[in-house]
Amino acid sequence: MRRAGDRKHRMIFHKTGIPGVFAIELEFNRDARGFFARSWCENEFRSHGLTPRIAQCNISFNERRGTLRGVHYQSPPWQEAKVVRCTKGSLYDVALDLRPDSPTYRQWFALTLSAANRRALYIPEGCAHGFLTLEDQTEVSYEMSEFYHPEAGRGVRWNDPAFGIVWPAEVKIISDRDRSYPDFVSL
């Protein structure tokens, strides 16, 4: 049940072409001081059929434009959902559907997240995630539904032809691990 005034603080969930992946916009209450916006609300997630849980929050700071991180996921039983947002700079954020029973298996969705647009991307369990920074000094915040389990950490290569992800800028910095994932074979 909403309280009076809650309407000005909604999170607006936009469906994407991938089931369970949502682009999230915040509704701002602005005045002379600046603004107020709700960035997390369990009821808002539940109203979209999502079961929110925050087990861990992470921050990724990226010195240079063209830094690519990903494309990562955790294998069962440690699969994770995440909400990704940019708190400084901007990035091109990618969700890749790796759920074999999904109608969008091996398809991807991308969205530009920035400190200016304050959008977020919800990525469900079974989808991989990666991003490319579009500005120097880009900071990314993640709310994760599961703790990090190194033994369950997996990834697919950012330029694997099995997916055809189109990145909007040159990849200049990438870890050896992310660069060396083998060609994808069905899960």
Positions of the model-derived regions?
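Conserved metal-binding segment of the jelly-roll/cupin
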Residues: 113-136
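Non-catalytic, conserved peripheral segments adjacent to functional cores
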Residues: 6-117, 137, 144-187
